């Protein structure tokens, strides 16, 4: 059997074949259908925007699964935070934990979103950026030892959706022209620009948006103002949000109280002195403060010690300068160059019980500074569309952590990871070779990206705070070396126009995920010496290899026939060198303890331990019935479906492929919308169906690794039940400049859990059972909003 399908059972191969056959049938039908264009444009004016859509395919004929969501589509989805942006995406979801829950976090870890899951990979394996500037990684939870694998203390939610004119979503390993390399995809938040609102004949714009969301009793007020002409123009955007805890629908335990507010502003200017240069400057700022309090439990999870009170602050500052040079001469067509800076701060201050009779304050921070530049060039020569680029960035991170009053040797928590500095340099070249085959366009697109990263620790002496057994020389011996790697990432795509409006493609790409600072330098218990020869610690590994992937995808996108659009893809990805923790003992593995401090006798060390594969398919379609029946012009249907399967296997003796718990269950979305353009109103009904799933536990994180074979786990995770949910929305253009909109979400008040955020819930203790209640998603909620545009 080919290595491509190694580890897949015949049943799974059969399922994949069925999916591929179904899409192939659709392609064959499309190739023989009328190659006419869609009668109704996908980009309508604000007066005819549908209230809710499942995204339709892009018109751009480019291989791969990349979609874009406009500011109008975000409003239609009721997208008012990090998670609701992906409300109607079949294979994308936001992961996180609810306030007060211990699932995947400690008593001093903040609640909220940790990142996105795309096609089964999540959090730090999915890139996030604002205007191309990468957002910080989610912090690992080394202070809870190996149990913290794939859970995070401080997440990646540094954004306000109102600030963005577009969100680009790349599924699967990133393309060669993407400087922020990730094996799981990328989500790029694009700030609004003056060009989004101004055009010849319209030199000013003012917009005001106000809306209310009952799920967390939040109010939002946003202002967008733009002015200028063809030479000089600018924009200012401000957003303010105030809210409380997000209510659950458990009927057993209310969400713990929270009160939060956020401010965001952005301003940018464009100077276009001539036809060849377009210079832009952008400044943006985001700050959110959250106050919360919740129960704090003993180690058994059966007794509440008291109430923890937490203040979390999240800040991001950004600045960039860019020049778009478009001479269209014999050497280049365009050259885009940009420099940028970003500073982020995350501060969690928690006053919490340290025992049944004492309290402590935990200060947990994560700060980063990013400096970078990128440049990209394009030139068309005959049938060749050549492009290339260079990029470089420097990221400094700090992880301050302390407890007050000074804890005992039994309860001290060391700084979770060393401060670090990371350099990344990359470049790419790509060629699109266009060929005409009997009036059908065909293109071959080879490309390659080369990436180099160097990460090294700084100020390692901070890891010795409050330790009598550890000094700077011990930490320097363990973590003193830098982690460096160079990756060559080739890709090739073939695309063919079945009709003038429908294309099919086949592509291969290689992906890479460099080790992050938590994996390299994360530590717990390293400075402790209270347990004698039973003393153990979790340690990072500066010698980690880069996680890599091979990604194969075949798809079709465009118009099947007039009035019917489609975007479908089937994919298979295999991964190696996944990072996890392996147990070693000083007596059994002395070679692993050469640089480990002498007070430690057992380690759980980060290693490239696992390999995995994920395969699946997704399809979305939009049908405009008015194309054939004039009487129902304005009636449309949206359909989307996503299916994935995956498994992972460690290098332990006797291990086997076990279902990958980060792979989400099957999901389908069906929507029906009516838009009356003449009267300026519309309504939509959207149903979401998700299959139930139970994650499979393994013993990999508790395995003794003493020469015996690994056994199956007896841990019983909660089966997350499937559900069906209905949303209803409507809008009304009261006047040319005023629009009212609203929606009812979870109309039937369905009690349900999000699988990706609830998959490791158990019912062993009272705290576990409380976590199940806290994880229930909101019941019936509503949103109301008004938009005023001039």
Give the residues covered by each predicted segment.
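Extracytoplasmic beta-strand/coil segments of soluble accessory domains associated
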Residues: 83, 87-138
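Short acidic/polar hinge/loop motifs at secondary-structure boundaries
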Residues: 116-117, 133-171
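C-terminal beta-signal and adjacent terminal beta-strands/loops
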Residues: 138-139, 512, 576, 689-705, ...
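A beta-strand signature from Gram-negative outer-membrane beta-barrel systems
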Residues: 153-207, 789
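Transmembrane beta-barrel wall of Gram-negative outer-membrane proteins
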Residues: 212-242, 252-293, 311-326, 434, ...
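Flexible loop and strand-edge segments within Gram-negative outer membrane beta-barrel domains
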Residues: 256-258, 276-332, 343-368, 403, ...
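Outer-membrane beta-barrel signature, preferentially recognizing the C-terminal barrel domain
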Residues: 306-328, 366, 416, 420-422, ...
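Gram-negative outer-membrane beta-barrel transporters
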Residues: 383, 435-438, 444, 451-453, ...
């Amino acid at each position: 059997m080919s290595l491509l399908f190694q580890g897949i059972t015949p049943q799974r191969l059969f399922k994949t074949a069925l999916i591929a056959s179904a899409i192939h049938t659709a392609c064959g039908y499309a190739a023989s259908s009328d190659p006419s264009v869609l009668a109704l444009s996908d980009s309508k004016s604000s007066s005819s925007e549908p209230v809710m859509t499942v995204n339709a395919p892009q018109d751009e004929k480019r291989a791969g699964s990349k979609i874009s969501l406009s500011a109008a589509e975000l409003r239609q989805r009721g997208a008012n935070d990090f998670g609701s942006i992906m409300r109607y995406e079949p294979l994308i979801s936001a992961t996180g934990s609810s306030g007060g829950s211990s699932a995947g976090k400690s008593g001093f870890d903040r609640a909220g979103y940790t990142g996105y899951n795309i096609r089964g990979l999540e959090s730090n394996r999915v890139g996030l950026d604002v205007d191309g500037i990468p957002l910080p990684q989610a912090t690992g939870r080394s202070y809870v030892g190996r149990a913290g694998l794939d859970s995070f203390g401080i997440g990646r939610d540094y954004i306000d959706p109102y600030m963005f004119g577009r969100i680009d979503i790349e599924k699967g390993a990133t393309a060669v022209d993407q400087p922020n390399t990730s094996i799981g995809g990328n989500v790029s938040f694009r700030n609004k620009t003056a060009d989004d609102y101004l055009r010849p004949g319209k030199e000013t714009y003012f917009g005001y948006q106000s809306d209310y969301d009952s799920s967390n009793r939040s109010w939002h007020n946003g202002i967008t103002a733009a002015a200028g002409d063809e030479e000089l123009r600018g924009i200012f955007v401000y957003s303010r949000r105030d809210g409380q805890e997000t209510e659950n629908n458990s009927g057993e335990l209310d969400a713990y109280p929270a009160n939060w507010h956020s401010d965001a502003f952005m301003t940018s200017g464009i100077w276009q002195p001539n036809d060849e240069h377009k210079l832009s400057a952008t400044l943006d700022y985001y700050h959110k403060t959250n106050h919360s309090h919740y129960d704090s439990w003993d180690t058994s999870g059966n007794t509440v010690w008291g109430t923890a009170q937490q203040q979390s602050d999240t800040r991001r500052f950004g600045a960039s300068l860019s020049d778009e040079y478009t001479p269209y001469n014999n050497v280049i067509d365009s050259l885009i160059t940009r420099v940028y800076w970003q500073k982020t701060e995350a501060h969690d201050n928690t006053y919490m019980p340290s025992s049944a009779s004492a309290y402590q304050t935990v200060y947990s921070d994560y700060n980063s500074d990013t400096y970078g530049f990128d440049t990209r060039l394009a030139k068309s020569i005959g049938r060749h569309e050549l492009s290339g680029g260079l990029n470089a960035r420097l990221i400094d991170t700090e992880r301050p952590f302390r407890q007050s009053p000074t804890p005992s040797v039994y309860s001290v928590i060391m700084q979770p990871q060393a401060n670090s500095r990371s350099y990344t340099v990359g470049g790419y070249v790509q060629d699109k070779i266009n060929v005409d085959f009997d009036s059908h366009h065909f293109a071959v697109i080879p490309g390659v990206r080369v990436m180099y990263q160097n990460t090294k620790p700084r100020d390692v002496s901070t890891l010795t705070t409050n330790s009598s057994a550890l000094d700077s020389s011990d930490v320097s011996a363990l973590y003193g070396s830098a982690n460096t790697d160079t990756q060559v990432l080739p890709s090739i795509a073939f695309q063919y126009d079945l009709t003038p409006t429908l294309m099919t493609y086949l592509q291969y790409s290689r992906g890479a995920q460099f080790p992050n600072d938590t994996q390299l330098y994360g530590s717990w218990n390293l400075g402790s010496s209270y347990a004698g020869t039973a003393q153990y610690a979790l340690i990072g590994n500066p010698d980690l290899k880069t996680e890599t992937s091979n990604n194969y995808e075949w798809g079709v996108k465009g118009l099947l026939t007039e009035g019917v659009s489609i975007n479908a893809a089937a994919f298979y990805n295999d991964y190696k060198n996944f990072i996890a923790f392996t147990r070693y003992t000083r007596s059994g593995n002395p070679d692993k303890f050469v640089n480990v401090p002498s007070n430690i006798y057992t380690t759980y060390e980060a290693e490239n331990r696992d390999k995995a594969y994920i395969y699946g398919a997704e399809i979305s379609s939009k049908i405009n019935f008015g194309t054939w029946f004039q009487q129902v012009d304005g009636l449309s249907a949206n359909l989307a479906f996503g299916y994935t399967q995956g498994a992972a296997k460690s290098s332990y003796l006797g291990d086997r492929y076990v279902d990958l718990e980060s792979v989400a269950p099957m999901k389908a979305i069906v929507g029906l919308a009516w838009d009356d353009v003449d009267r300026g109103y519309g309504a939509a009904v959207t149903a979401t169906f998700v299959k139930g799933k139970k994650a499979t536990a393994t013993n990999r994180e508790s395995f003794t690794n003493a020469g015996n074979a690994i056994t199956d786990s007896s841990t019983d995770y909660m089966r997350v039940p499937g559900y069906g949910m209905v949303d209803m929305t409507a809008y009304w253009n009261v006047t040319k400049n005023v629009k009212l909109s609203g929606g009812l979400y979870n109309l039937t008040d369905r009690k349900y859990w999000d699988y990706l955020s609830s998959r490791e819930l158990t019912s062993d203790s009272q705290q576990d059972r409380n976590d199940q209640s806290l994880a229930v998603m909101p019941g019936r909620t509503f949103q109301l909003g008004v938009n005023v545009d001039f």
